[in-house]
């Protein structure tokens, strides 16, 4: 039986819909935590799940029997939140966890100790009880990811081009940021890319809650020293477009209803006109005396 303890950080990601945390290796398998900061089927709760990473590429028939605990760390005290220990079988179609891990309002509560400086800390502890199928993932290899340094930020290759363009257009964006920890800096930059991606959607695809979340996230990044006036302006533009779109849709529905009523009135009037034409035509017809002469 092999026991492993992994600590994961969600950095300002509490505003996003889904966050997949960095995988860690236990007994030859890569495991990962997936967090749903807005809840998954349980709105208003942090949802947290554990699964074997890249399970679709693993050999046919593999399974892992594991006992695990997921802990939400209170960073201001020793009173962390830890649900009961769970024992389950994992395979390529199953992930286990807690859909209602912890209420979001308590996480966001002032001085709660869970969300500190935009950072939520989660600890996963896993005991492997039984192994079916050989996976053999190297711990040294699996935990290393290729990264690229862009203007002092350690990024994934897929992020580097976008971030380079951001610095070209806004060279002062990170000139006064406070965090020095590379993981925190990477987390902030990932959040920025997510915000840009969100605002790139059409106004119809975004809810008012989405725009409110973006506003809060921008505020968090500005508090960390990022210069994001340009992104705030984009947010206001998108919000205005959404407002104009909704107002236009409302006017259009009202006009369509009026047009429908007018068409109905016209249809009734046309029927009356035809009826009146028939009466006029009958009145103009010559009288017949066949019945009397």
UniProtKB/Swiss-Prot annotation:
SMART domains: MATH. Residues 227-285 form a coiled coil. Residues 3-126 form the MATH domain. The lineage of its organism: Eukaryota, Viridiplantae, Streptophyta, Embryophyta, Tracheophyta. It comes from the Eukaryota. This is MATH domain and coiled-coil domain-containing protein At3g58400. PROSITE patterns: MATH. Gene3D superfamilies: Apoptosis, Tumor Necrosis Factor Receptor Associated Protein 2, Chain A (2.60.210.10). Keywords: Coiled coil. InterPro entries: MATH-CC_domain_protein, MATH/TRAF_dom, TRAF-like. Pfam families: MATH_2. CDD domains: MATH (cd00121).
